[in-house]
Amino acid sequence: MTIRSPEPEVKIVVDNDPVKTSFEKWAKPGHFSRALAKGPSTTTWIWDLHADAHDFDSHTSDLEEISRKVFSAHFGQLAVIFIWLSGMYFHGARFSNYEAWLSDPVNIKPSAQVVWPIVGQEILNGDVGGGFQGIQITSGLFEMWRGSGITTELQLYSTAIGGLVMAALMLFAGWFHYHKAAPKLAWFQNVESMLNHHLAGLLGLGSLGWAGHQVHVSLPINQLLDAGVDAKEIPLPHEFILNRDLLAQLYPSFAKGLTPFFTLNWAEYSDFLTFRGGLNPVTGGLWLTDTIHHHLAIAVLFIVAGHMYRTNWGIGHSMKEILEAHKGPLTGEGHKGLYEIFTTSWHAQLALNLALMGSLSIIVAHHMYSMPPYPYLATDYGTQLSLFTHHTWIGGFCIVGAGAHAAIYLVRDYDPTTQYNNLLDRVLRHRDAIISHLNWVCIFLGFHSFGLYIHNDTMSALGRPQDMFSDTAIQLQPVFAQWVQNTHAAAPGFSAPNAAAATSITWGGSELVAVGGKVAMSPIPLGTADFLVHHIHAFTIHVTVLILLKGVLFARSSRLIPDKANLGFRFPCDGPGRGGTCQVSAWDHVFLGLFWMYNSISVVIFHFSWKMQSDVWGTVSQNGVSHITGGNFAQGATTINGWLRDFLWAQASQVIQSYGSSLSAYGLVFLGAHFVWAFSLMFLFSGRGYWQELIESIVWAHNKLKVAPAIQPRALSIIQGRAVGVAHYLLGGIATTWAFFLARIISVG
């Protein structure tokens, strides 16, 4: 950290009225492009319109103008999110059984959608308990509302209205900061100020505000609900906030006010700031006093972090200095030049953020079941499965997006003159070694992981179970994972002496937690089957990374096409007369990476779904625990045939037999999504010329009848066809999985 003489204060950097508001301009499709603004001559126009509408790089090369468009679009995105959230809360207020669910969250299922009887589809309104007919939802919103202290539908209405007000504010802000007071480029590039405000403001004060809400509103309300007090008898939130005596009745330290805080006698507050670990046995969720403690600690950390970077006062860190000082003995110029990349290429910035955000989303997926944060979330198996699946899919898409934008950065924004012998340059220069080694790793993982499975299938087929890899024959125990589990399970009383229980029940060493006769969470034993599946995970993830990384590292040039950078981010082939140069653009690598991402995530969510049904989820009685699939994972998941027979086929019976029941929509979606998936193959396995010939024949027939269209029909380009193909492939696959999972888990869970 360096202290300098104070630098001149940062001036307010905006341009006033830079772009006039014009409805005439907005009403003209393609107004952002000279070519598109002329209007359509062929059907390709509508595809190009969609491809380029948000590709601000193609509208202008002025970085300031691009930055303003992105900034303004973010406000539009926030407005959409607020409207969507408002709709969720409105459904909770108007069409849901939330108040009934609050009274008996174990036996009544959450529902916030009632189907109107138009052509007999009111069959979809299943009996969710508590005298309510509707569609069972698996979003986890009821549990979140309960955890935040919402007890009435009026509160949900009010929040929904608040969401619409915020949406209006965001729409106004998007217009204002583009048309009235648009920030200058220097403002977008002022990273220290941005870090300070985002860290201290968004994350720090955001967490502090949430901790405050949890202490003064959520905690007393949840405490009373847990004790069995009727929601209608509980004081309203503002009464707890304004009347300290109400809180002091539940938490005696409130009577002392802020005295313990200023006298540093903080232990006084340990009645509502705890470090217990484990789960609340009443709700099956994390202890609310633990999560309050967590948010308070996070707030302190981030508020401190938000004072670390040098702005007007000449004190603190400079990102440029930190990066340029970051040199090792083996890495040349180290991070020199990276500051310039991240302040002039928003694609590079976005790639980094997407990679981190995607990884974080997958980490969230794993914590949502192992440390369920909301009351009664853990016993709502449909919601648990949905949340895990959702967060892993989101993570997968974000990580592929990171590969896409990293490649776009290299094609459009990379400046070789400023990148000499720094880390990026060095990685690009030994890309052949990186990719060939990664390729070897993929081959090794692929042959060995599938080799173990094929060995097992062969032995099983030959009737030699004693020669299989399984927990009852040749064991391949995941010893490192078991060591990690045991270390965490032993931490309370050993390396974490102040914790009452381990961070998660899943580590083992403790009893399972059951709520209302349903298992909330139990230790998760790992065995040979998990070892085998784990190596399939390693294989699919490494292949996804291989495809994306090859696309990035060879985005500008390769031995095959040395001038690739001149062809752009997406191109079908390197022109006529150069056979074997198709499917080499950076875009094609993203296209191929998406399929492997789909492979990766599918295996992950199948593993999770079956493992939980087999070893965790179930009911508790005097005779012990009865799991949904009776612990069949350890034997079934050791062969490919077992996955097909004992998981896919055995668990598809609910969705296949759903006709005539309230789950029949899932049966239709299962069928329809299979069709959407199959439809994608028509685009993926077909050549452009085939369709062009067909179109010309059809156009000839129209000309004969004198009904020829003014806009000339054209076949999709190769890239457009692939984009349509991969979109339907993923959409069909995801919707099929969704219907399969939900029909199954709502039936048996």
UniProtKB/Swiss-Prot annotation:
Q: Which InterPro entries match?
A: PSI_PsaA (IPR006243), PSI_PsaA/B (IPR001280), PSI_PsaA/B_CS (IPR020586), PSI_PsaA/B_sf (IPR036408)
Residues spanning the membrane: 70-93, 156-179, 195-219, 291-309, 346-369, 385-411, 433-455, 531-549, 589-610, 663-685, 723-743
Q: Report one GO cellular component.
A: chloroplast thylakoid membrane
One family name in Pfam for this protein: PsaA_PsaB
Gene Ontology molecular function, alphabetical: 4 iron, 4 sulfur cluster binding; chlorophyll binding; electron transfer activity; magnesium ion binding; oxidoreductase activity
Residues the entry annotates as binding [4Fe-4S] cluster = C573, C582
- Which residues of the sequence carry a binding annotation for chlorophyll a? M682, Y690
One of the GO BP terms on file: photosynthesis
According to the record's subunit comment, the protein's assembly and interactions are: The PsaA/B heterodimer binds the P700 chlorophyll special pair and subsequent electron acceptors. PSI consists of a core antenna complex that captures photons, and an electron transfer chain that converts photonic excitation into a charge separation. The eukaryotic PSI reaction center is composed of at least 11 subunits.
Q: Protein name, please?
A: Photosystem I P700 chlorophyll a apoprotein A1
